[in-house]
UniProtKB/Swiss-Prot annotation:
Record function comment: Protein that plays a role in the inhibition of canonical Wnt signaling pathway. May be involved in neuronal migration during development of the cerebral neocortex. Involved in the control of ciliogenesis and ciliary length.
Protein name: Doublecortin domain-containing protein 2
Subcellular location field: Cell projection, Cilium; Cytoplasm, Cytoskeleton, Cilium axoneme; Cell projection, Kinocilium; Cytoplasm, Cytoskeleton
Any GO CC annotation of this UniProt entry: axoneme
CDD domains from the UniProt entry: DCX2_DCDC2 (cd17152)
Reported tissue expression: Expressed in hair cells of the inner ear.
Doublecortin domain mapped to chain residues: 17-100, 139-221
SMART domains: DCX
Length: 475
C-alpha cells in the first residue's frame, strides 16, 4: 500500500532538466541554454559532449563543469539542478568573473522629477547690450618715411594683441616701409612727438617712421592732406585715406560757381541762376542770393565810370611805377591779320609763262619748216624720173608735185615768211654750237623716224585736187 504501484510507475514522465552554461573566462558570452533529457543524456560524459557542441568554446572540448560563484567542480549528472547556472571549462583552472551579470541590461534608476514650478525672478542687474560692446578690430595706421614727401603713405593693420609688444610692432613697420638707414627704431607723430608704446597709437592716424637718424621736421600734414581731415573718431573703421575737402560733388557747388561767373556783370545782362523744383533747392538758393548781392555791391564799386571795362586794374601796381610807356613810330612793325592785308597782284609768273610758250612755239615751227623743206626737195628730185618712166601719168600728178614743191604763190609766200622769221635764230644757234654740233644734229635727223607731212593749201587748190581725183577715178 505504501510503495508505488506498477501502473503509476509506468505512467510517470521522463525527467528533463534545463541549465544555462557560460564559458570559462569569457566576460562577453551571455550563456547558452542546454536541455538534459533523461533518455538521451544518460551519463555525465554525454552531458559534456552536449555542452561542447552548444557552447563552442575556443579552448576545445569541455572537460569540467563549475558553479558560477564559488567555482565548485561538478562530477556527477545527479548534482546538476534544473534551471541552474554553470560554467563550462577545459583543462584550465576556474576563472572568477561575475558570470551571472553578463548579458543583463542594467536599468538606470528614474530620477525624481520636481513637479513644483518656481516663479520667474526679475533681475535688476544692469548689463550692457551686445551692440554696445566695442569690437576688437585691428588698429589701422598710416606710415610715412622720414623726410619723404613724395611717396604716398602706407596703410598698416596691427592686431590688438600685438600692440602690447612694441618690438613686434616696429618689426611690422620695418616690413611695410623700407628706409635707407635700415630698420625702423622709432615712430613719431606729424608734430614730432615720440611714440613709446602701442597704447599711444590711435586708429586712423599718420606716423613718421624713423631709423637711426634724427627726426626731420617737415610739413608732412600740409603737403599730404588738410589738417581738418586728420582726426577721426575712435573705433571708426579706417579703410582708406581721409576724404578730400572741397570736392566738386559737394552741395551747392553749382550755384556757387554760377554766382562767381556773374561777378562784375550788369544787372540787365547778368544770367539768372537756373530754377529747380523741390523744397531743398529753394532753401539752397537763399545763401547764393546773399552772396550775389554782396559781391555785386563790391563789383559796382570797382568798375570805373569811363566805361573801360572790368579788366582794367583799379589801382596802379607797384611793379609799373616809374616805367615809361614806349610810343609807336614809323619803324614799329605791326602784324596785321591776313584778311586785313591789301591784295597784291603778281605779274612775274604770267610773263615768264608767256616767254616760255613763245620760245616753244618757235622751236616747233623751225623743226617743222626744216622737215618740210627737206621732203619737198626730195619729191622735186623724184618727179622728173617718174615723168620719164610714165609719160601718160605725168600730167595727172603735176598738181600734187606743184603743191609739195612750192610752185603755188600762196603756199610759197607763207613758207617764205616763216623761214624769214626763224632764219636769224637758226643762224645764231648754228654759229654758237660749231661744226661738231652740226654734224651731231645731221646724224640724229637721219636716225629719227619720219614725221607726218604738213602742207598748207588754199580752198581753190583743194577744189582742183578733188576734181583731179575724180577724173583719175573715172579713167
Amino acid at each position: 500500500m505504501n510503495g508505488p504501484s506498477p501502473r503509476s510507475s509506468h505512467l510517470s514522465q521522463p525527467v528533463v532538466k534545463s541549465v544555462l552554461v557560460y564559458r570559462n573566462g569569457d566576460p562577453f558570452f551571455a550563456g547558452r541554454r542546454v536541455v538534459i533529457h533523461e533518455k538521451k543524456v544518460s551519463s555525465f560524459d554525454i552531458f559534456l559532449k552536449e555542452v561542447t557542441g552548444g557552447v563552442q568554446a575556443p579552448f576545445g572540448a569541455v572537460r569540467n563543469i563549475y558553479t558560477p560563484r564559488t567555482g565548485h567542480r561538478i562530477r556527477k549528472l545527479d548534482q546538476i539542478e534544473s534551471g541552474g547556472n554553470y560554467v563550462a571549462g577545459g583543462q584550465e583552472a576556474f576563472k572568477k568573473l561575475n558570470y551571472l551579470d553578463i548579458g543583463e541590461i542594467k536599468k538606470r534608476p528614474m530620477e525624481a522629477v520636481n513637479t513644483e514650478v518656481k516663479p520667474v525672478i526679475h533681475s535688476k542687474i544692469n548689463v550692457s547690450a551686445r551692440f554696445r560692446k566695442a569690437l576688437h578690430e585691428p588698429c589701422t595706421i598710416f606710415l610715412i618715411a622720414n623726410g619723404d614727401l613724395i611717396s604716398p603713405a602706407s596703410r598698416l593693420l596691427i592686431p590688438r594683441k600685438a600692440l602690447n609688444q612694441w618690438d613686434h610692432v616696429l618689426q611690422m613697420v620695418t616690413e611695410k616701409i623700407t628706409l635707407r638707414s635700415g630698420a625702423v627704431h622709432r615712430l613719431y607723430t606729424l608734430e614730432g612727438k615720440l611714440v613709446e608704446s602701442g597704447a599711444e597709437l590711435e586708429n586712423g592716424q599718420f606716423y613718421v617712421a624713423v631709423g637711426r637718424d634724427k627726426f626731420k621736421r617737415l610739413p608732412y600734414s600740409e603737403l599730404l592732406f588738410d589738417k581738418s581731415a586728420m582726426r577721426r573718431p575712435y573705433g571708426q573703421k579706417a579703410s582708406s585715406l581721409p576724404p578730400m575737402v572741397g570736392s566738386r560733388k559737394s552741395k551747392g557747388s553749382g550755384n556757387y560757381r554760377q554766382s562767381k561767373s556773374t561777378i562784375g556783370s550788369s544787372d540787365n545782362s547778368s544770367p539768372q541762376p537756373l530754377k529747380r523744383k523741390g523744397k531743398k533747392d529753394s532753401n539752397s538758393e537763399k545763401p547764393t542770393k546773399v552772396k550775389q548781392s554782396v559781391k555785386s555791391k563790391n563789383s559796382h564799386q570797382a568798375i570805373p565810370d569811363n566805361d573801360e571795362g572790368i579788366f582794367k586794374a583799379g589801382a596802379e601796381r607797384s611793379e609799373t611805377r616809374g616805367a615809361a610807356e614806349v610810343q609807336e613810330d614809323e619803324d614799329t612793325q605791326v602784324e596785321v591779320p591776313v584778311d586785313q592785308r591789301p591784295a597784291e597782284i603778281v605779274d612775274e609768273e604770267e610773263d615768264g609763262e608767256k616767254t616760255s610758250k613763245d620760245a616753244n612755239q618757235k622751236d616747233d615751227f623751225s623743226a617743222m619748216n626744216g622737215e618740210a623743206e627737206d621732203r619737198a626737195g626730195s619729191k622735186v628730185a623724184d618727179a622728173p624720173e617718174e615723168e620719164e618712166g610714165i609719160p601718160d601719168q605725168g600730167e595727172k600728178k603735176a598738181s600734187p608735185s606743184r603743191v609739195n614743191g612750192g610752185t603755188d604763190e600762196e603756199n610759197g609766200e607763207e613758207l617764205d615768211q616763216v623761214t624769214e622769221e626763224l632764219q636769224p635764230t637758226v643762224d645764231e644757234k648754228g654759229k654758237a654750237e660749231g661744226d661738231n654740233s652740226a654734224q651731231d644734229e645731221a646724224g640724229l635727223d637721219a636716225q629719227r623716224p619720219p614725221r607726218p607731212e604738213v602742207t598748207v593749201t588754199s580752198p581753190q587748190e583743194n577744189e582742183g585736187n578733188e576734181s583731179n581725183k575724180a577724173s583719175s577715178a573715172v579713167a
